[in-house]
Amino acid sequence: MLWDLSGGMVDQRFLVILCMVAFLAGCTQSPVTASVIVMEMTGAQPVLIWLLISSIIASIISHQFSPKPFYHFAAGCFLQQMQARQAEELRSKTEQEK
């Protein structure tokens, strides 16, 4: 679909790389890191500026939907689950001692 919008003027591989970096930057909200990782994975050093632009835009849009990056959100949920499990174990242990 995106390739059709370009009228076939843009190489499909370039669009795939831009979408890769946008997805990674949107999830991590780390545009520079996402750009460097995708650049190193694909060997796309000549298009680094386009990777940075795409990742910055994706990161800004992602921040509008969720102020926290995905990994911070996931870590918070994991921490809450572990604290609840630990509290339950402590509660059952004190009940057994009675």
UniProtKB/Swiss-Prot annotation:
Membrane topology type: Multi-pass membrane protein
Pfam families, per the entry: Voltage_CLC
Membrane-traversing stretches: 14-34, 41-61
UniProt GO molecular function: chloride transmembrane transporter activity
Keywords, in A-Z order: Cell membrane, Membrane, Transmembrane, Transmembrane helix
GO cellular component, one term: plasma membrane
Localization, UniProt: Cell membrane
Gene3D superfamilies: Clc chloride channel
Name under which the protein is recorded: Uncharacterized protein HI_0633
Species of the source: Haemophilus influenzae (strain ATCC 51907 / DSM 11121 / KW20 / Rd)
